[in-house]
Amino acid sequence: MLQPKRTKFRKQFKGRIHGASKGGTDLNFGAYGLKVVEPERITARQIEAARRAITRYMKRSGRVWIRVFPDLPVTSKPTEVRMGKGKGSVDYWAARVAPGRIMFELDGVPEDVAREALRLGAAKLPIKTRFIQRIVE
């Protein structure tokens, strides 16, 4: 699963996702991509589940690029613990994705295979996404 090797601080504020994505909105590596339509936090487990679904359908042919990285530590307190006594320990890692962000890119497969692979990957994610492809001139 994806997570940072080391961080400057162990815990972070929750934060909010405002507006559209500043960067990562264009296809840079592959010919096909999965674009985010709504803002959300995506966990490392969800990214990994989507990646597995995509690569499994492609039968190891072609190439997959993951364009998001879970660098946000999400904390939680144990069950049945009273409020207070500090912030909980890090439970999992997440990535903030804003609308317009490209999450996955594919190349080396036909369009119908890429479309279906990304559809299966999108089913593992808790957000609305859109299939996009590079415009060849």
UniProtKB/Swiss-Prot annotation:
The gene is rplP1. Disulfide bonds: none annotated. Belongs to the universal ribosomal protein uL16 family. It holds the Pfam family Ribosomal_L16. Binds 23S rRNA and is also seen to make contacts with the A and possibly P site tRNAs. One of its GO terms (molecular function) is rRNA binding. GO terms for cellular component: cytosolic large ribosomal subunit. Transmembrane segments: none annotated. Part of the 50S ribosomal subunit. GO terms for biological process: translation. This is Large ribosomal subunit protein uL16. It comes from Bartonella bacilliformis (strain ATCC 35685 / KC583 / Herrer 020/F12,63). The keyword Translocase does not apply. Keywords: Ribonucleoprotein, Ribosomal protein, RNA-binding, rRNA-binding, tRNA-binding. Gene3D superfamilies: Ribosomal protein L10e/L16.
